[in-house]
Amino acid sequence: MSSLLNFYRKVLNVPLSLLVKSRAIPTDPVKELNLNLEQPIIYVLPYTSQTDLLILQKNCLSLNLPDPLQNNELNGQSLPRYVFLDEGRRFFKSKGAKSETESIFYRYLDLHRNNESLDVQLIPASVLWGRSPGKESEPHLRLMSSFQRIISMIWFGRDNFVRFSQALSLKYMVAEHGADEGIAQKLARVAKIHFAKQRYSAMGPRLPDRQAMFNKIIQSPAIKVAIEEEAKTKKISIEKARQEAEKIVNEIAADVSHESLRIADRVLSWLWNKLYQGINVQNGDRVRKLALEGHEIVYVPCHRSHMDYLLLSYLLYHQGLVPPHIAAGINLNFFPAGPIFRSWGAFFIRRTFKGNRLYSTIFREYLAELFYRGYSVEYFIEGGRSRTGRLLEPKTGMMSMTLQALQRGLTRPISIVPVYIGYEHVLEVDTYAKELRGAEKEKENAGLVLRVIKKLKNLGQCYVNFAEPIQVNNYLNQHFPEWKESQAEDSRPKWLNEAVDSVAHQVMININKAAAINAKNLIGSVLLASRQRALAREQLIEQVDSYLQLFKNVSYSDDAIVPNDNAEEMLNHVLTLPRSGVISEKDSFGEMIRLDRESAVLMTYYRNNIQHLFVLPSLVASIILHHESVSKDLIIKTVNRIYPFLKAELFLHFEENDVRNQVEAILTEFSAQRIVKYESDVLQINCVRVRALQLHAAGVREILQRYYISLSILLEHPEISRAALEKESRSIAQRLSILHGINAPEFFDKALFSTFSASLKAQGYFDSEGNCILEKAKEAEEILRSLISVEVQLTIQGAMEKVEEVENTETVVKTAEAVTEKNE
């Protein structure tokens, strides 16, 4: 290597060290890309740039990867550890693929002929300067001159990413395709195509001319018809209806600015460092793979907080992906937040537009246009933020529009990426508790934002897990093959409603499969399982350890995140969190850990984030606890009867025929932990560890009580309507929560009783005329009664009698009033 080039690199390193701060994608390539550091590595860069090469070198050294400027010494040959695919702008020439690169590829391939132990890993690596794709009217620029590179160094030095791609095994290439010069040329061509796809996945399509996009939408046939209908219905001119349509488009549409996104990146980096001790991201490689394969990506996260919007876009940006266009509630379109969010990719949607055909048509066309142009999209399928910490029933309007866009002939495949977002502290949790107690929801405004900002300090850890994607084209081909049949544009296909519900439900299941257990939600779950919300420190540690072993040995799913910390470390972490509500107290017997009274209600929010993970073990524990000695077959039979209700309520992923294996694994684990005695297919309480069994069983206690309330009412009044059943169940649940100190606000949530009554219907507890099938309901009621304390049973029966007395009194009063009115 020439001394002149070495000198040039040393000089160039000076401004680079001062001006450039780059970030690696992924952050741990050795682990995430499964690199074998025992085997040689060769880096492939898209075109000649000493600047990019030096930035790559700096990142490789910091990530414990081999230095690209050092050669690989193989079989007596010294071969470069990097290659450039293109000449770049050396001496104002751009010759295309370099013959020397193909020659180096060939020499590496040739080494594999007689060396079976050799496996050179070819890693595509590119350096991104800024992330703006430019405007549609601008020419495509690929290579930069020296002057442009200097300007980029100054302007984009802090917006610099080094992207490592999945390694290609040259041993595999030789085994499959041989090692001639043609294969070397093919490698270079494939690498070029890869870099083009990678650039598109990181920068996305070019930004549209906003007015031209508006005009295209307004001129679409569907909107022209809607404008004419609006004019006719409201008896206004076509021009006035068109102006109204333009106002609606302007109200909805995003106005993305990459300069605004760059500023947001700086601000949010500061904010996250101030707020969180760490942001844990899992499975980002799934999304990067889909983007490289050219999929239209739709992100569908659960909705815990307003922070979700900002957090997901920020993380996608740092995963080397394009921040999506985000469907945001119109309530967030207030000054100054509205214009800022719009520049970050938010497009606004009204809470309801039922009956407003012009608005619904425009919104559907705008969403279809985003898909057509290749922009990724994000929306919250729950419709609003969960106030209880559980997933809400999906609102399917946006999902319906997504499937309709595909059905209309979208050329790119659509992949829906469910996303689990979890926090150790949700900023709005106090507000949620007030709203659940009946307070009015406070309208979002600048003052509210300022009050929230005052709370911004240590909020613990944050978790984002990209769940298993749903490749919609494949899903529809498998479950709804008729979807490809042509339909008139304004007609609604017969398959659509069922397909929308099916995909939406699968999204919720996949989100729950990707749940993250953290210190706060696990410690909180254990304390809430104790009736006094308090445990001795040793007992708490023992129970948390029991849960950790259970989650690791009998995993809910491969995507669920189980912490690596031990119980002691998790408890110490929670005790340091401000406003956690977990208090340590000492007396003459030792240390006690308890929840303060006010925080008990708030902690149910965090428990509910992961309740679905332990509800099946809790049910198994409850059956053993109440029977004391019970056969395995009876446990499985009981679980099978109750499981469909749990599955519907908590979006569990086990199919009915998988439940037996899961229950057997739970029993084996309980036995291994000596929580129960397991001999000859009979389970018995182990008196030494009965407290651990009680705490496990408590996780499902309140759910079973709710089911028992509804079935008791149904048996007492078989002719009752579903609406009346839900209303009466809720009234009794409210009374039970007061008398037995049940702090969970969702205990009398009308949505849960509605879900249960729908499950009863789906499971065949009603005949075709809507009448209760008494024998089946009685069997289920007896099973539930065996799992509920006598004290709770008596309270429920007493409440039912009170309700009946009130109803009888009301009937007498109404009859008397009718007689009086008749006599008058």
From Swiss-Prot:
Compartment list: Cell inner membrane
Group of enzyme by EC: transferase
InterPro entries tied to this protein: GPAT/DHAPAT (IPR022284), GPAT/DHAPAT_C (IPR045520), GPAT/DHAPAT_LPLAT (IPR041728), GPAT_PlsB (IPR028354), Plipid/glycerol_acylTrfase (IPR002123)
GO cellular component: plasma membrane
Keyword Lipid metabolism listed: yes
SUPFAM superfamilies recorded: Glycerol-3-phosphate (1)-acyltransferase (SSF69593)
Catalysed reactions, as listed in the record: sn-glycerol 3-phosphate + an acyl-CoA = a 1-acyl-sn-glycero-3-phosphate + CoA
Topology of this chain in the membrane: Peripheral membrane protein
A single BP term in Gene Ontology: CDP-diacylglycerol biosynthetic process
Main subcellular location of this protein, as a coarse class: membrane
Pfam families: Acyltransferase, GPAT_C
Coiled-coil residues: none
Residue interval(s) of motif HXXXXD motif: 302-307
Pathway membership, UniProt: Phospholipid metabolism; CDP-diacylglycerol biosynthesis; CDP-diacylglycerol from sn-glycerol 3-phosphate: step 1/3
Classification via NCBIfam families: plsB, PRK04974.1
Family: Belongs to the GPAT/DAPAT family.
Domains (record comment): The HXXXXD motif is essential for acyltransferase activity and may constitute the binding site for the phosphate moiety of the glycerol-3-phosphate.
Protein name: Glycerol-3-phosphate acyltransferase
Organism whose genome encodes this protein: Actinobacillus pleuropneumoniae serotype 5b (strain L20)
Gene name of the record: plsB
